[in-house]
From Swiss-Prot:
The keyword Signal appears for this protein: yes
Disulfide bonds: 49-107, 155-214, 281-325, 367-408, 450-508
SMART domains associated with the record: IG, IGc2
Glycosylation sites per record: 211, 313, 393, 400, 507
Predominant subcellular localization, coarse grouping: membrane
All ranges on the Extracellular side of the membrane: 20-533
Domain Ig-like C2-type: 21-120, 132-230, 237-343, 346-419, 430-530
Gene3D superfamilies, A to Z: Immunoglobulins
Residues in compartment: Cytoplasmic: 557-764
Protein's recorded name: Irregular chiasm C-roughest protein
Length: 764
């Protein structure tokens, strides 16, 4: 305790001595010492140093090398001690900072004149940062690569302090972190560094024509500098197969090149059977020089070197077929495939089969249907029409109620329903169901049929007659045919050249594994029809058919004659108006032109009894006119030296002169010496007289005389033995022709103007 008090007293005395103003000197000390700093090249750095009670000389050292004691630090232009002596501030200012300034600095004060001890500050490290140079990619601006073959891209950034940080970014803006190798190499000055980053890239099609960039930066400058390179990637074709729909139809099921128009079919849609299908193969490749090949179920298609393939008639055999398109270029080959989904109508792959079963046994009927989409199958029992199943297989226990006929019906939307039937037969003894009385014709071949339902199938069928079994040894008169029918058997006994003694009662016996059945069948003779009656009947039928044929032919010919002729041909017409005058135009040659007979109607109004008719028949047409009067007839006929022209009748009313002009045909009746009448037609021409009435000038045509016995002879109008009588046919007897028979009626280019027709030649 005493020792402690002594120590405290000693310390107090020492403190009082140091703080006393009467002390002979005071120690110098640092009020502020320099600290470690970091600066970028070109920046300004100040290392602080303040000294209290400075007695000695102050200087800065750089890596233990003294810089000088004066404030301007001569010899070091970028260095200076800033501050004031009064404040004891001797801070070191460096501007601009250079890489050489990267060192350890210390502020030192030498001992004072009165023996004050020297003092030194702590070392302060100045770290100088240098931004890196712009990065460079050693491969240049473009690198050529092949898909899936690795390449290396190197990015170098030089002169950074610290070494530059390098970041890789792909063409999509994604930062790459994998498959990168980063190394730092010091420069010879051992202060700066070269940073190198190698990107090991596996090129893909997506990288084609994209830019990869590397970014370099360090703590001296956080603004990155970058370099980029464009990647040209050669890649194998990228293939896509599309199924295109087309119009229904197409024949032959052939596979060929490009087809017609089509519609893109979405995935999952079905192709209708028998339609035309076009498949398109799209390929993206670099280089683009490619070769196409098509396959169906790995079988190459001949001529399939195009971008499209057409199946002209797609059938159900193409359902689920794999259509593959293979495309190849210099880099490699690739492929794509599409599975065809064909919609087709249902068809039976396996029809239900009839079965034989015992009561209580279990049977299974199978109905396999091929269709797309899958069919709806329904089993129906007949005759109840009750649905008993809806699956491919129908299994049930056999009984009297379940035995019978079953229908399998398959339905697919958009297609016709199909059905098939099968029988389930109960096994038992046979039962004969034939007619008990059958007939034959004496002298002809007779047949007796014995039908028996037999499940299982009959193993023996026999015939007996008058107690004796009929067999192959019974003579050549008999033969037996046995045919299997659904659910039974049919036996036919054939009797050749049957006679009366062959007719009678026959027994048919059917035997199977479950029993037998016997039926007695009566064979009766039916009366034959006599040969004479057969012949008479046949002749009657033939005669009736012959008469009927003749009547039909006559009816058809008569019906054809009643048909109207064409509009420009007048084959026959009659004119009967107040005098019984009739005319008939007969062609001398069937190839003649009927249109030479023309009817011209001038104006739109024809008064009653006034006819405007113009005939100009060719020579080969003969016009025969007959006029009945007092039991005699006059026949007028022109030959090809004369023309019969019935000119247009014109009626003009003039209010001042009250004149009327009428052109009428003239008829000359000639009495021959033989008592017959001959006539001539005189073509008339209008000659106006002073009194306003027209006179007629005529040309005489040749006349054909008609003798009482009906013969005709050509007569000359100049014969001395004839007497000519002039008879003017009144206008009421003028010929009337339906204007629709005119060629002008149907052809406006043949219609003439209102000018008058040329007059006929004047008679001499």
């Amino acid at each position: 305790m005493l020792h402690t008090m002594q120590l405290l007293l000693l310390a107090t005395i020492v403190g009082m001595v140091r703080s006393s103003p009467y002390t002979s000197y005071q120690n110098q000390r640092f009020a502020m010492e320099p600290q470690d700093q970091t600066a970028v090249v070109g920046a300004r750095v100040t290392l602080p140093c303040r000294v209290i009670n400075k007695q000695g000389t102050l200087q800065w050292t750089k890596d233990d090398f003294g810089l000088g004691t004066s404030r301007d630090l001569s010899g070091f232009e970028r260095y200076a001690m800033v501050g004031s002596d009064e404040e004891g501030d001797y801070s070191l200012d460096i501007y601009p900072v250079m890489l050489d300034d990267d060192a350890r600095y210390q502020c030192q004060v030498s001992p004072g004149p009165e023996g004050q001890p020297a003092i030194r500050s702590t070392f302060a490290g100045l770290t100088v940062l240098v931004p890196p140079e712009a990065p460079k990619i050693t491969q240049g601006d473009v690198i050529y690569a092949t898909e899936d073959r690795k390449v290396e891209i190197e990015c170098v950034s030089v002169g950074g302090k610290p070494a530059a940080e390098i970041t890789w970014i792909d063409g999509l803006g994604n930062v790459l972190t994998d498959n990168i190798e980063y190394t730092v190499i010091p420069l010879p000055d051992q202060r700066r560094f070269t940073a190198k980053s190698v990107l090991r890239l596996t090129p893909k099609k997506e990288h084609h024509n994209t830019n990869f960039s590397c970014q370099a930066q360090n703590t001296a400058d956080r603004t990155y500098r970058s370099a980029k390179i464009r990647v040209e990637v050669k890649y194998a074709p990228k293939v896509k197969v599309n199924v295109m729909g087309s119009l229904p139809g197409g024949a032959g099921g052939s596979v060929g090149g490009a087809g017609g128009g089509s519609v893109h079919m979405s995935t999952g849609s079905r192709i209708v059977e028998h339609s035309q299908v076009r498949l398109e193969c799209r390929a993206d490749a670099n280089p683009s020089d490619v070769r196409y090949r098509w396959f169906i179920n790995d079988e190459p298609i001949i001529g399939g070197q195009k971008t499209e393939m057409v199946i002209r008639n797609v059938t159900r055999k193409f359902h689920d077929a794999i259509v593959k398109c293979e495309v190849q270029n210099s880099v490699g080959k690739s492929e794509d495939s599409e599975t065809l989904d064909i919609s087709y109508a249902p068809s039976f792959r396996q029809r239900p089969q009839s079965m034989e079963a015992d009561v209580g046994s279990v049977v299974s009927l199978t109905c396999e249907v091929d269709s797309n989409p899958q069919p709806e199958i329904v089993w129906i029992q007949h005759p109840s029409d009750r649905v008993v199943g809806t699956s491919t297989n129908l299994t049930f226990s056999v009984s009297n109620e379940t035995a019978g006929r079953y229908y399998c019906k398959a339905n697919v939307p958009g297609y016709a329903e199909i059905s098939a039937d099968a029988y389930v037969y109960l096994k038992g003894s046979p039962a004969i169901g034939s007619q008990r009385t059958q007939y034959g014709l004496v002298g002809d071949t007779a047949r007796i049929e014995c039908f028996a339902s037999s499940v299982p199938r009959a193993r023996h069928v026999s015939w007996t007659f008058n107690g004796q079994e009929i067999s192959s040894e019974s003579g050549h008169d008999y033969s037996i045919l046995v045919d299997a029918v659904p659910g039974g058997v049919k036996s036919t006994l054939i009797i050749r050249d049957s006679q009366a003694y062959h007719y009678g009662k026959y027994n048919c016996t059917v035997v199977n594994d479950y029993g037998n059945d016997v039926a007695e069948i009566q064979l009766q003779a039916k009366k034959s029809v006599s040969l004479l009656m057969t012949i008479v009947g046949g002749i009657s039928v033939v005669a009736f058919l012959l008469v009927l044929t003749i009547l039909v032919v006559v009816y058809i010919k008569c019906k054809k004659r009643t048909k109207l002729p064409p509009a420009d041909v007048i084959s026959e017409h009659q004119i009967t108006k107040n005098g019984g005058v009739s005319c008939k135009l007969e062609p001398g040659d069937r190839t003649s032109n009927y249109s030479d007979l023309k009817v011209d109607i001038s104006g739109g109004y024809v008064p009653y009894g006034d006819y405007s008719t113009h005939y100009s028949p060719p020579p080969q047409y003969l016009t025969t006119c007959s006029t009945k009067s007092n039991g005699s007839s006059t026949i007028m006929q022109n030959n090809h030296q004369n023309q019969l022209q019935l000119q247009q009748q014109q009626q003009q009313s003039h209010h001042q002169h009250h004149t009327q002009t009428t052109t009428l045909p003239m008829t000359f009746l000639t009495n021959s010496s033989g008592g017959s009448l001959t006539g001539s037609i005189i073509g008339s021409r209008e000659i106006r007289q002073d009194n306003g009435l027209p006179s007629l000038q005529s040309t005489t045509a040749s006349v054909v005389s008609s003798s009482p016995n009906g013969s005709c002879s050509n007569q000359s109008t100049t014969a001395a033995t004839t007497t000519t009588t002039h008879v003017v046919v009144p206008s009421s007897m003028a010929l009337s022709v339906d204007p629709r028979y005119s060629a002008i009626y149907g052809n406006p280019y043949l219609r003439s103007s209102n000018s008058s027709l040329l007059p006929p030649p004047t008679a001499v």
